[in-house]
C-alpha cells in the first residue's frame, strides 16, 4: 500500500517538539509548534516559552526526564482537552536521559486509521 500524502488524510499537524536538560530548553519545534507558541520559543526553557500550558504539562516533562519512561496525560488548555505525550530521548553512549520529545493532540482530533494490509 502506498502512503497517502498528509493533505489527503485531512489531519491537521499538531504541536511537537524536543527539549533538553532538566530545565527543558526547547531545541526543536515543528511548524505547528512555532505557529502555536512563536518562533522565539525555540531556545527558551519550556516553562518560559510555552505559555498557556498548565503546570500539569510541565510536571509530565519533569517526570519523563527524571524517570526515563514515557508518559501521557490529558491537559486542559484554551477550554479544550489535549493529550500530551512525552518520551525520553536517551544518549546511546551513556544511556542517560538527555531530553524529552513531546507532542500535543486535541481530544476532538479524529484518530488516524490505516487500511488493513
Locate each region found by the language model.
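Short, surface-exposed beta-strand-loop junctions and turns on beta-sheet-rich folds
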Residues: 33-35, 90-91
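PAS and related sensory helical modules
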Residues: 34-50
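Sensory coupling linkers of modular signal transduction proteins
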Residues: 89-117
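Sensory modules in modular signal-transduction proteins
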Residues: 1-34, 117
Amino acid at each position: 500500500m502506498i502512503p497517502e500524502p498528509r493533505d489527503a488524510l485531512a489531519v491537521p499537524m499538531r504541536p511537537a517538539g524536543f527539549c533538553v536538560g532538566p530545565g527543558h530548553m526547547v531545541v526543536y519545534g515543528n511548524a505547528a509548534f512555532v505557529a502555536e507558541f512563536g518562533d522565539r520559543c525555540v531556545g527558551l526553557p519550556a516553562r518560559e516559552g510555552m505559555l498557556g500550558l498548565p503546570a500539569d504539562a510541565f510536571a509530565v516533562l519533569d517526570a519523563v526526564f527524571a524517570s526515563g519512561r514515557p508518559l501521557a496525560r490529558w491537559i486542559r488548555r484554551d477550554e479544550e482537552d489535549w493529550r500530551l505525550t512525552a518520551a525520553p530521548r536517551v544518549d546511546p553512549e551513556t544511556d542517560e536521559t538527555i531530553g524529552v520529545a513531546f507532542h500535543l493532540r486535541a481530544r476532538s482530533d479524529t484518530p488516524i486509521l490505516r487500511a488493513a494490509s
